[in-house]
A protein has these predicted regions:
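Beta-strand/loop substructures that line and gate deep hydrophobic ligand-binding cavities in soluble
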Residues: 82-129, 133
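Short loop segments at secondary-structure junctions
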Residues: 12-14, 75-76, 100-102
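Glycine-rich portal/gate segments that line the openings of hydrophobic small-molecule binding cavities
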Residues: 39-84, 137-148
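Amphipathic alpha-helical hairpins
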Residues: 2, 8, 30-38, 43, ...
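Intrinsic-disorder/low-complexity, polar/charged segments enriched in Ser/Thr/Lys/Arg/Asp/Glu/Gln
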Residues: 3-7, 48-50, 65-67, 78, ...
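Hydrophobic/aromatic beta-strand elements that line small-molecule binding cavities or substrate pockets
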Residues: 6-8, 37-39, 55, 65-72, ...
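Hydrophobic ligand-binding cavity/cleft-lining segments
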Residues: 1-48, 105-107
Length: 148
């Protein structure tokens, strides 16, 4: 599956946007496709987080579970994440936050693969489209939360 790239401009300062993006435990409160996010491990300085996620795929009446490791860089305003284990065959990516004065650009790049045995190309295409929608919806949800 190709890389999913998405970007959004948020009407809010970078400190506020970055802080909300780091608060992954709160995501299920405002992202309906997420059932839960639980922190399993956090480094003393908070730069490394291992978390368990449960997502909901309504179209297929199923849930996806995965554990990921996030490496946050406060200075560069980035997060690099990768799959530890879970339902995905491949899951990795990065988030970058760019200061635009009173606005922030949030760039997301994710490489994700979800192999379903005996599923045809049409269904895989639907899954790829759904994953792109989920990334876009996540960025929109963070934008909505920051802009209030």
């Amino acid at each position: 599956m190709p890389k999913i790239q998405s970007s959004i401009e948020i009407d809010g300062p970078i400190d506020k946007v970055f802080a909300l993006a780091r608060d992954i435990e709160s995501f299920p409160e405002f992202m309906p496709d997420l059932k839960s996010v639980n922190i399993v491990e956090r480094s003393e300085d908070g730069s490394r987080i291992v978390s368990e996620w449960v997502g909901i795929v309504k179209e297929f009446k199923t849930t996806l579970k995965w554990t990921e490791e996030d490496i946050w860089d406060d200075k560069a305003r980035t997060c690099v994440f990768s799959l530890v284990k879970g339902d995905y065959s491949k899951y990795s990516g990065n988030w970058a936050f760019t200061d635009l004065g009173d606005k922030t650009r949030f760039d997301s790049e994710i490489e994700v693969e979800y192999d379903v045995p005996l599923v045809g190309a049409l269904i895989k295409g639907i899954i790829a489209k759904k994953m792109k929608e989920n990334v876009d919806n996540m960025l929109e949800a963070i934008k909505g939360r920051v802009e209030g």
